[in-house]
């Protein structure tokens, strides 16, 4: 545990309501046979020093915990040509095994390439208040899903999931005024080490409604628009093929296209493209020689966008039909 301030030493005095800033870290190696890993409150609060502090504080009085953010990071250890999917979900921690994961308690669901890094930063808008004498139950769970990836016993890890939880803790007094915290939009970041135009799928519950990660507002799409679409036009690439091609194109493909269009008149301020035929042939080859499992990604994205804007989604979809 890092970031425990010296103020924590004063928590034993009931008349002191100063807060202690804390950061708790947990990591776990992920293997193909672990299709669903739940990282619960025991992992996040399991560090000995913090547990002693919490237990001591709850014996004296009620405790107020303000969680500023939870950061979840996927660190891959596999080769880029290994077509596998990583899924990360943040949801409420139910206390019965019969709860349906695909319900109102799910906040974020993300699916991406297992060979690329993935990071979610989530800011809970709620405050945790624990009554004197109670045990501390952490109300959120992070689920990690490796899909259908299989490994033999003794195989190396596919990657590692890392979680940081940042919060402040202080004694709770009825007379203390606690101001409600406005919602902060979560952020999703990902790696483009081997696939420069790739964008993961994500569905996010906001204060009003459920929204998808908008591929067409990302830097990756802006690059694809500049490098490819401006030169070949939308007649050469079907709208449903844009997302599959973006997910497929490698760094080598990007460098080859940039090499072929570097003398294009458009790049020198001209009014028309002078390399269209060359770039069209390259894109056609890329579109033919790629993994076909991406074929429906464009249509699926359109469906998720339509479902969100029409209000059809009342729960966060688990993106079970997305695979890499």
Swiss-Prot record:
Gene name on record? sc4
Top-level taxon of origin: Viruses
Q: Where in the cell is it found?
A: Host cell junction, Host plasmodesma
Query: How is the subunit organization of this protein annotated in UniProt?
Result: Interacts with nucleoprotein.
Give the region (Disordered) as residue ranges.
1-20
**Could you state a single Gene Ontology molecular function term?**
RNA binding
Q: Does the keyword Repressor apply?
A: no
* Species this protein is from: Sonchus yellow net virus
Q: State what this protein does.
A: Transports viral genome to neighboring plant cells directly through plasmosdesmata, without any budding. The movement protein allows efficient cell to cell propagation, by bypassing the host cell wall barrier.
Give the record's keywords alphabetically. Answer: Host cell junction, Host-virus interaction, RNA-binding, Transport, Viral movement protein
Write the protein's name.
Answer: Movement protein
Listed under GO biological process in this entry are: transport of virus in host, cell to cell
| One GO term describing the cellular component | host cell plasmodesma
């Amino acid at each position: 545990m890092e970031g425990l301030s010296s103020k924590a030493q004063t928590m034993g005095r009931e008349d002191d309501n100063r807060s202690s800033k804390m950061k708790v870290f947990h990591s776990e190696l992920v293997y193909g046979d672990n299709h669903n890993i739940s990282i619960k409150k025991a992992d996040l609060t399991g560090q000995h020093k913090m547990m002693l502090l919490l237990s001591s504080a709850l014996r004296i009085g009620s405790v107020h915990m303000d969680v500023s953010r939870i950061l979840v990071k996927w660190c891959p250890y596999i080769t880029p040509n290994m077509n596998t999917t990583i899924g990360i979900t943040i949801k409420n921690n139910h206390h019965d095994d019969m709860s349906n994961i695909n319900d109102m308690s799910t906040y974020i669901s993300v699916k991406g390439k297992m060979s690329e890094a993935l990071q979610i930063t989530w800011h809970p808008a709620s405050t945790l208040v624990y009554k004197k004498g109670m045990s501390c139950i952490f109300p959120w769970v992070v689920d990690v899903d490796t899909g259908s990836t299989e490994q033999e016993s003794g195989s190396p890890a596919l990657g590692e999931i890392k979680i940081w939880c940042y919060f402040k803790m202080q004694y709770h007094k009825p007379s203390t005024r606690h101001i409600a915290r406005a919602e902060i939009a979560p952020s999703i970041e990902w790696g483009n080490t081997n696939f420069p135009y790739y964008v993961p799928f994500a569905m996010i519950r906001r204060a009003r409604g459920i929204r998808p990660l908008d591929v067409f507002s990302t830097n990756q799409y802006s690059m694809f628009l500049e490098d490819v679409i401006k030169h070949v036009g939308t007649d050469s690439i079907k709208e449903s093929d844009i997302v599959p091609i973006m997910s497929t194109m490698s760094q080598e493909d990007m460098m080859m296209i940039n090499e072929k269009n570097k003398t294009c008149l458009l790049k020198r301020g001209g009014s028309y493209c002078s390399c269209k035929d060359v770039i069209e042939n390259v894109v056609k080859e890329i579109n033919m020689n790629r993994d076909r499992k991406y074929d429906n990604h464009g249509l699926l994205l359109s469906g998720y966008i339509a479902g969100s804007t029409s209000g059809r989604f009342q729960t966060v979809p688990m993106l079970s039909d997305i695979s890499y």
